[in-house]
Curated annotation (Swiss-Prot):
SUPFAM superfamilies: Viral DNA-binding domain. This is Protein E8^E2C. It comes from Human papillomavirus 13. GO terms for cellular component: host cell nucleus. GO terms for biological process: regulation of DNA replication. One of its GO terms (molecular function) is DNA binding.
Amino acid sequence: MAILKWKLKRSTVQEVSIAGPASYSTTTSTQASTAVSCSASEECVQAPPCKRQRGPSRPIGNPQNTQSIVCVTDYDTLDSANNNINVNHYNNNKGRDNSYCAATPIVQLQGDSNCLKCFRYRLHEKYKDLFLLASSTWHWTAPNNSQKHALVTLTYVNEQQRQDFLKTVKIPPTITHKLGFMSLQLL
């Protein structure tokens, strides 16, 4: 008789183990009300969906070793081609050699937007093997920016390709250029 009462009580109470792991029910509230009946003294509470874990589940590398961090840059500096700028706090190399880092050599062209667009089209037609990617024409935005110069950024596979580009291509006198490195990974 005690077993029958236990089975009857168990069949009318929500069959979720309190000590077990919570899972999210995919049934609607109408389906849940027909599938599980609750007594007036108990509250029917559905477990919330589990949030997925973001990022790696364990730290990559040795967390105590800061030397394993690639390209930890100083946010105040923009160009590592300047010999006086140390772009990496953990790097003793203050020169132009950026082989320690996954930095992409770039040439930044500055001038009138129409001149830059025409020049970029000529580069794609005649010198497409001398650079990797060319950006669209863009501007820096700031409330007090009085300069109306446009910019185009050219990226290269390595510094040798950039040197070959600068030796081969004649940059028009209305366009100025600056050398640098971009520490973003490109597609």
